[in-house]
């Protein structure tokens, strides 16, 4: 590894540990010539994953594209950037674990909606309203009814757990 200060190409690893995301190794290195310490990150190189859009075109999987959609949907909501980053990481892990070369944009959208439903219902509705391209109020009302039923089901099961 080349030293960022003197450009010497030999360094020794002083410390090595797994980074917070679990997919990266963080290494502290020391230049053998000028003794400058610097940090490097080692990450598994992943094969490119293509997203097949609804019109049949293909584009490279973009974590940032998902991030932008979720951030926009979560505006003025009590959702932290850490929550969003963790959500995006879970989605990317699921996509890479379940699809080798190609994944449909519909599958990604459904994964995002599943994750958002657990994170924040308003963010979920905002994302769904754009993703699903609702044609009328009845479709939005049906989505809200699904959420209401799911929330009631969770509350009922937690009450049942407390009484037993």
UniProtKB/Swiss-Prot annotation:
The lineage of its organism: Bacteria, Bacillati, Bacillota, Bacilli, Lactobacillales. InterPro entries: ATP-cone_dom, NrdR-like_N, RNR_NrdR-like. The gene is nrdR. It comes from Streptococcus uberis (strain ATCC BAA-854 / 0140J). Belongs to the NrdR family. HAMAP family: NrdR. GO terms for biological process: negative regulation of DNA-templated transcription. NCBIfam families: transcriptional regulator NrdR. GO terms for molecular function: ATP binding; DNA binding; zinc ion binding. Residues 49-139 form the ATP-cone domain. This is Transcriptional repressor NrdR. It holds the Pfam family Zn_ribbon_NrdR. The keyword Transferase does not apply. Its cofactor is Zn(2+). A zinc finger (unnamed) spans 3-34. Keywords: ATP-binding, DNA-binding, Metal-binding, Nucleotide-binding, Repressor, Transcription, Transcription regulation, Zinc, Zinc-finger. Binds 1 zinc ion. Negatively regulates transcription of bacterial ribonucleotide reductase nrd genes and operons by binding to NrdR-boxes.
């Amino acid at each position: 590894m080349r030293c960022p200060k003197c450009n010497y190409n030999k360094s020794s690893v002083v410390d090595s540990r797994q980074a917070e995301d679990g997919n990266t190794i963080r290494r502290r290195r020391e230049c053998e010539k000028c003794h400058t310490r610097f940090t490097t990150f080692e990450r598994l190189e992943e094969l490119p994953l293509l997203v097949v859009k609804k019109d049949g075109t293909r584009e490279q999987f973009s974590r940032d594209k998902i991030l932008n959609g979720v951030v926009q949907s979560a505006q003025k909501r009590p959702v932290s950037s850490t929550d969003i980053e963790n959500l995006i990481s879970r989605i990317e892990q699921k996509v890479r674990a379940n699809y080798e070369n190609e994944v449909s944009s519909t599958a990604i959208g459904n994964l995002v909606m599943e994750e958002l439903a657990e994170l924040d219902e308003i963010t979920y509705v905002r994302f769904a309203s754009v993703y699903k391209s609702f044609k009328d109020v009845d479709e939005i009302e049906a989505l809200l009814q699904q959420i209401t039923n799911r929330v009631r089901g969770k509350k009922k099961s937690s009450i049942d757990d407390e009484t037993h």
